[in-house]
Amino acid sequence: SDGLILICPSRTADCRMEMYNADGSQGIMCGNGVRCVGKYVYDHGLVDKDKRTITVETLAGIKTLELEIEDGKAVSVTVDMGEAALTSRLPEDITVDGKEYRFVGINVGNPHAIYYVDQVDCLDLERIGPAFENHERFAPDRVNTEFIHVADRKHLEMRVWERGSGETWACGTGATASVLASILMGYVDDEAEVSLQIGR
């Protein structure tokens, strides 16, 4: 498993999400996870069935979710990720395993380092992922690492190495951070689709 999500009571929102990575460390935010929480609490009657907007307390703040409902079930959940913050120069150079890389640091509730590569399919993430995650530049908290290929101005291909979990099939906050970094770098237009291992 990539980790564990607990749905708990909240005094400030409809519910509170606690998220733990595969290594047992507590995660700050999980974009896809908070969307799953929204679907779960709606579908299981933990919030009023008249609601189309719900709030979830996270360590990254309260997130607002918009629900699309069909036949009494949430079929789509979107989340306002909140404000992002640039956490590096644009771009910043870094040496990992003796090789120079350029990255863009973005925080969307949790830290991400976005690296641009010629192709994502041939990367040996099991070997290089930990070196990026645990690099001294990101100490002591570590970093989620996205490897991005810019297919065109409206399409990114992404693989992700998540801190505490390793390579995962998808990462909502990582996709958000990658699109923002790519816009700031001038690589994509104001909207772009991100292809991951299991979807877009």
Functional labels for PLM-detected ranges:
Residues S1-K73, A113-R200:
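A glycine-rich beta-to-alpha transition motif near the start of alpha/beta enzyme domains, typified by
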Residues S10, L59, D80-G82, I106:
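Structured loops at beta-to-helix junctions and adjacent beta-edge loops in soluble globular domains
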Residues I54-V56, P91-G98, V104-I106, A192-V194:
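Short acidic-hydrophobic surface loop/beta-edge motif
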Residues K73-M81:
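Short, solvent-exposed secondary-structure boundary/capping segments
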Residues G82-S88:
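Ligand-binding beta-strand-loop-alpha-helix segment within the catalytic cores
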Residues S88-E92, L125-R127:
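Short, charged, solvent-exposed linker or helix-capping segments at domain edges/interfaces
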Residues R89-L90, G98-R102, F132-E133, N144:
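Glycine-rich, charged/polar anion/phosphate-binding loops
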Residues T95-C122:
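Internal active-site segments that recognize and position negatively charged phosphoryl groups
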